[in-house]
Design a protein with these regions (language model features):
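N-terminal Sec-pathway targeting helices
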Residues: 5-12
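Exposed boundary/loop context
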Residues: 8, 17-19, 180
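Charged, low-complexity intrinsically disordered terminal segments
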Residues: 2-5, 25-174, 178-508
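Bacterial N-terminal signal peptides
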Residues: 13-23
Length: 508
């Protein structure tokens, strides 16, 4: 390789120094924008029929990706007045583009759309986001954005190194409200793998479709984030290269899913909403949501605590049983104490999380691995999802054989009557760093249904049960019993061992 002349090498060095100096010094400042509120509930349109069926709070579990996709699309297609969508991740894949296509159609009908998305996974998507937000009826905001934009996640991270503390705080909330009548709340992001459509690996997740008086609280939650000073209009962050926005752009990428989920007539929509409200579970509901930081997201005093406090209180008040499903399970010291106290009171604690092979974040599994013995010793029952679960076909579109299953759901069932479902995992990142949202429902019938839906996930053909035998961990399932983690390879175990020895637990 030829050497650069001294002058050229000097310019390269100076350029790199300037690059890193710029990355370390610049800071994005929050905005002051006029406050906006949710559009009042529509009195017309297919969604309004739910008010004639159920005036009290009602809930329906969205157990499978197909159910979740069908009801989301139906809500978007049924809206006539407003649509508010808050999410952590929205990928440019089949499902992601299907949502964009249907949202554009809604906007063309005159629906006022507000989209609020966290900036964690938006690298390379500024132009498609700008084209979506260019529609006169669509407002698109990015929460806690990276000030220096890039199409590469790596270069974007380097460019913004000086703001690591601020950018470490993320909005993990997931919520959709349509026409002020219904909402969807839970764990799903907007991408193929959350709806069973990824060709390689998909998630088992859980959400609630809800209606009733709680909708006004959910709208207020959305407004609080929408009006936060760290919610930036996308046009403040990047410049649109082409003004044309076309449904065809997104429809072409979503063709396969579009034929699977065709649009319905207004009469079909109204009938579907009437029936789901009639068949729903009824129960008192209370929203728990982390407040957006008052000043800068990195401020210790502003760290979210509302959802964490409620989760810990729920377990702390349990009298007989706690069933906790969490994609990532890394108990904080406070949560560990709460679980220990529950077991000491005679409460049965049953936990379901990812195994080494089903986890999409190996570092999270590695840190959790350090806590397994402690959880077992305090008396908890610990289960891990099998990536090759026999019943994974329930959550995955065909063909299933070559597809892996992972867990992404986040919910608790306490004493067979209280249900807490939302976006929060039982880990330090959800409990102490990110903002989260969750709905607490007091309903024995809903709890019974969720327990029935979850039983299949705990079954030995679908999950490993962990034991501590003479100081060694043992994984047991329907067809085998092993003393090493069920990794896909020895190298995966080596990677996990490496991560387990890094000082990263507080960030997981």
């Amino acid at each position: 390789m030829p050497k650069l002349p001294f002058g050229s090498r000097s310019k390269v060095v100076l350029g790199l120094l300037a690059f890193f100096f710029q990355a370390a010094c610049g800071q994005l400042e929050p905005l002051n924008l006029p406050s906006e509120s949710a559009v009042p509930a529509e009195e017309a349109g297919p969604l309004s029929v739910v008010e004639t069926v159920a005036r009290q709070n009602w809930q329906i579990p969205l157990n499978t990706g197909r159910d979740a996709l069908e009801w989301r699309l139906r809500a978007i297609d049924s809206a006539v007045g407003s649509l508010d969508l808050q999410t952590f991740l929205w990928l440019d894949d089949t499902v992601g583009n299907l949502f964009k296509e249907r949202i554009l159609k809604a906007a063309d009908r005159g629906v006022k759309v507000r989209i609020l998305i966290d900036d964690s996974f938006l690298a390379g998507q500024d132009q498609s986001s700008l084209r979506l937000g260019a529609h006169p009826n669509i407002s698109y905001r990015v929460y806690n954005p990276y000030g220096r934009r890039s199409n590469s996640t790596v270069s974007r991270t380097v460019l913004n190194l000086g703001e690591f503390s601020r950018l470490d705080h993320r909005m993990h909330n997931k919520l959709m409200v349509a026409d002020g009548h219904i909402a969807i709340i839970g764990g799903r992001n907007l991408a193929d793998e959350y709806f069973g459509m990824d060709p390689q690996s998909n998630f088992r997740d859980m959400e609630l479709l809800v209606g009733g008086p709680i909708i006004s609280d959910l709208e207020a939650s959305f407004d609080s984030y929408w009006n936060d000073r760290w919610a930036f209009p996308i046009e403040k962050l990047a410049r649109l290269q082409t003004q044309n926005v076309s449904i065809n752009e997104f429809a072409a990428k979503a063709k396969t899913a579009s034929t699977e989920f065709p649009s319905e007539t207004a009469a079909q929509q109204q009938s579907a909403w009437r029936n789901v409200a009639k068949e729903s579970y009824r129960g008192r509901a209370r929203l728990h949501v982390d407040a957006p930081p008052k000043d800068r997201p990195e401020a210790i005093a502003d760290r979210p605590a509302q959802v964490a406090n409620e989760l810990e209180r729920l377990i702390g008040d349990a009298r007989s049983e706690v069933i906790a499903v969490s994609a990532y399970l890394i108990p904080t010291p406070t949560l560990t104490d709460v679980l220990r106290d529950a077991e000491a009171r005679g409460v049965d604690v049953k936990l379901l999380t990812n195994s080494i092979n089903s986890n999409n974040h190996l570092s999270a599994y590695a840190v959790y691995r350090n806590h397994i013995a402690e959880l077992l010793n305090l008396g908890a029952e610990v289960h891990e999802v099998r990536a090759d679960a026999k019943d994974r076909y329930r959550y995955i579109f065909a063909p299933v054989v070559e597809k892996k299953l992972g867990l992404h759901a986040k919910y608790l069932v306490v004493d067979r009557r209280k249900v807490f479902i939302g976006s929060a995992n039982l880990d330090p990142r959800s409990l102490r760093i990110n903002t989260e949202i969750g709905l607490l429902v007091d309903s024995p019938s809903l709890a019974k249904e969720l327990i029935a839906l979850t039983e299949v996930d705990f079954a030995p053909e679908n999950a490993w049960r962990l034991e501590n035998v003479d100081g060694s961990l043992v994984w047991s399932s329907a067809d085998t019993r092993r003393q090493t983690s069920p990794a896909e390879s020895g190298f995966q175990r080596l990677e996990a061992w490496f991560f387990a020895h890094l000082p990263i637990e507080a960030e997981m």
